[in-house]
Amino acid sequence: MTITRRELCVLLSGVFPAIALDALPAEDNSIPSAHYAFDQLPVEVLEHAEMRRVLKGKLATGEALEVHETTLPAGGAPHATHHHLHSEMWFIREGTVELTVNGTNYRLSPGGVGFVHSNDEHGIKNVGTTPATYFVVAVGPGADA
């Protein structure tokens, strides 16, 4: 069987749009562009910390995103070291924390930034004598879970 150029063009013009549509999300339920009054965001009091959630959901490009602020008491840690699929960044606002990444400890103070890749074993704790406050930005699979 031989296909002419014309038949090929007709065939491809029907195939490529279908492929492109399959690549698009079925529904755009991404986080909308907005602004937030930080002092009006609710504070959750957890067992080992206080947390103020800023954003949680999907980006328009499909990645999961979660952003929150955590305050740890002196000596406190939100949880034991762990790992997960998404990557995380910490932006330290107040206090002194120790970020452990794959067994190596890093001390971060206000203005310090920490980052872990997907599946790196990590944990954070307040090693100071005053509360420590930091922002967490999580991006990737499961960040919005």
Residue ranges and their predicted role:
Residues S118-A143:
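Ligand-binding loop in jelly-roll beta-barrel domains
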Residues E69, V101-G103, N126, V136:
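Residue-level recognition of conserved beta-strand positions in structured domain cores
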Residues H68-H83:
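Conserved short histidine dyad/triad with adjacent acidic residue
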Residues A77-H79, E98, G114, S118-I124:
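Histidine-centered metal-chelating micro-motifs
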